[in-house]
Amino acid sequence: MSERIRVPVALLRRASEVLLNHLESVEGDAVLVEKDYYWTIAAEQLYDAYAEPSKFTMGQLSECLENLERVVEDPSMSTSFALVWLADLLRGAGQTVAR
């Protein structure tokens, strides 16, 4: 069964602003993330809660950071997948600060 969830972009924008302001007040202008590599689950398995994932790959936060720096320098390079890089970095920052 597939359930679609409507996610308002305005909510994402406002939540990002609120949470990044909080992060900045706690950590300053940068977060020192101690781990660079992380596990990812294949996209086709990530949201299948009824099957145990079997396809794992490695991601690298420094690569996500480089990719986002390029997008910021040249917004014409923006792609929807850049949101995944942003999400990976936000997860790394959030998990670092939450410890």
What kind of feature is each model-predicted range?
Residues S2-I5, V9, R13, A51, ...:
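Amphipathic alpha-helical coiled-coil segments with heptad-repeat character
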Residues A15-S16, A42-A43, A87, G94:
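Small side chains
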Residues L23-E34, A51-K55, E73-S80:
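Charged, low-complexity interaction regions
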Residues E63-R99:
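Amphipathic alpha-helical binding modules
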